């Protein structure tokens, strides 16, 4: 009920202002007596994925808490894991505003943020200050100014920095808002990146005496042939997990709706069926050897169950959380 009232206020603001206001309030209240506003008990339903024990199967997708400022607040809402980022080696402003739009008719969101973040050092400071007892994933990307051909170096630099503080590392090569980034999903470019990441992972495992799994985050806009090729590479390089999927460039499901013509990635309910279909296709190729984290359009228990049935071991929410609030976390955790 409280969130419904809060939402009516937030939705009077433009989406990015609403986001920034929310982050600011959560940051102020987390760890204080005021966190009763959003703190809730959820059932303990531990699940083992990527060699980690997750308190439950519902996580916060990357992009909502880019700089890791509100980890404890989101933890208080019952998330079993929180994926912060996407973070880049150095701070960058992202694309020009306006860059986030609500597709209200279908509970969708279009964004072209462009990896706006305060840089990896700032994120690490926030992660170190967190008291969250669940799993923290750190989602890494490349800077806008780094040529795609040299993108591998940005990922390795971020990996070096975050490795001691992450429970898992998510490698984002699928945002549609950084020019050329999605080209890293294919062929030799993907194989070179995965090979370099695995070599560095082995070196860092020795250095820190701990193994931090790597999960690759992919786009939903893939042909069947591309899915087969990516799955083959994941298996060949023994990548620890797959996050499926990021936002879509497809607009078929929101034709004629508000802001449908805006450039950027579409998320929320319109993405549900497309992302679930991609998960099912990857599951058929990976045959249980690599776990899948399902994300895209989950805004109710049924949608979450569909992701699990398609082959996901965990689910993440973002847009559904914007539209439905913390109660969505509790509903899914307790009923999935």
Curated annotation (Swiss-Prot):
Substrate binds at residues 66, 111-115, 172, 177, 246-247. FMN binds at residues 62-66, 86, 139, 172, 217, 245, 268, 297, 318-319. Keywords: Cell membrane, Flavoprotein, FMN, Membrane, Oxidoreductase, Pyrimidine biosynthesis. CDD domains: DHOD_2_like (cd04738). One of its GO terms (cellular component) is plasma membrane. It catalyses: (S)-dihydroorotate + a quinone = orotate + a quinol. The keyword Membrane applies. This is Dihydroorotate dehydrogenase (quinone). It comes from Psychromonas ingrahamii (strain DSM 17664 / CCUG 51855 / 37).
